[in-house]
């Protein structure tokens, strides 16, 4: 089993790096505002048609453009969901969503969280899935990538005040990166058996003679961008454990690769844009180290089995509860770590049925800000926040003003860094406390004791960090939970983006200082270790008390 796990992890990372490197080169061209080969003429026509100028924006203008797009998308999506019954492509005549559920779902997909307090096949029409959710899957992913583009330019430019044109960045990211790659993935999914149609649900008679209604729909197209954009919201309630979303071992591998593809490629793009590829590789190695350790822990925990099931006479010595037999323990464990290391939230197994330690690792990966590869764009700008914190700590130890890529890190940058890093922990801890203090919050818990608290902590961690996965034992479709999690999702997304853009605006105007003998090298093993230590330290200090009340207490209560 150990050899199989090692081969699975190694082959996954090898294929990922092979695919990510050329994509990183294309992303680096977009960061430099250089059109990809053969599209310059098309872009000129697009700019004229859409009324987009070549005028570059400062950080406030860039941020305002992103906020305007997302708030407009939020309003439109809410209306689509609320008045769904009056809109076309609704063969099952599904009614509109309640106000609190429509708000929760709209915020969820606009913020790239894709938390789902509903069952897709019994709640949403094809029009809502296509014109509402799928569109936001593209736009929310493009928003995250645009933010990290602006931050990277802040490090690579000097003595200017502009970070690029947000509208041009969004169009280029969507048309030349997200759409073509998603199209290729969707065609592969269709070939593997994922449905792509607008047919009404199909009644069938099973081999046992029972009547059943098979859901249909444009699944493959939404599934592709769901994974590529680290969105995670499933067309069906069972998400990627459903055979219509994830039918084979090949689609399972493709989905995991799609989740990490752009986050890994952005590391290569960062190195190329900075003029020092070692800088991007250092971040990639730090992410990969934490990722491999986390996968190993989850695999080990799930292979040990569940003592309660073993005592009840379970056939398998490994923990197969909540897992698909076509994937098994190892692939399910890898998928769980991939989807929570990134801000994806798609699942091919029920995380609520993992062992105490096996479920704690995905929860912790979300709580540290999903900086281990992370979401498209958000993972890299989240890790760069920890880089700034790491060089600040190193500067304190050696008595020098901290620098990164030749830019001095001053008080303003550190204040914004601290604010961005502290936003989500405050939401998680205060939100979990509020839920546990109120009857409306506690009534949603399926299980008592430590596992019930873990369900609450996981849900708020998932929402605040824009992941979207859940310990499904929590009945979260209530006005209290819909409003609480919508607030956490919105503030967790834009409460980080705003200080990140402020950091970019401050750094872009600074001059690049030449390296000296006292400059800390930020691409060697020493700095990689310091960066990993910083991530672990912040995660440990912030969440160990809460984790001790949930998964840790549950683990030590096992027979």
From Swiss-Prot:
GO biological process: potassium ion transmembrane transport
GO MF, one annotated term: potassium ion binding
InterPro entries for the chain: KdpA
Compartments in which it is found: Cell inner membrane
Family annotation (Pfam families): KdpA
Main location: membrane
Gene Ontology cellular component list: plasma membrane
Membrane topology: Multi-pass membrane protein
Disulfide bond found in the keyword field: no
Record field: transmembrane: 5-25, 27-47, 63-83, 132-152, 170-190, 253-273, 283-303, 327-347, 356-376, 379-399, 416-436, 484-504, 524-544
Keywords, sorted A to Z: Cell inner membrane, Cell membrane, Ion transport, Membrane, Potassium, Potassium transport, Transmembrane, Transmembrane helix, Transport
NCBIfam families, per database record: kdpA (TIGR00680)
Family classification: Belongs to the KdpA family.
Protein task: Part of the high-affinity ATP-driven potassium transport (or Kdp) system, which catalyzes the hydrolysis of ATP coupled with the electrogenic transport of potassium into the cytoplasm. This subunit binds the periplasmic potassium ions and delivers the ions to the membrane domain of KdpB through an intramembrane tunnel.
Subunit relationships: The system is composed of three essential subunits: KdpA, KdpB and KdpC.
The protein's name: Potassium-transporting ATPase potassium-binding subunit
Organism: Salmonella typhimurium (strain LT2 / SGSC1412 / ATCC 700720)
Encoding gene (name): kdpA
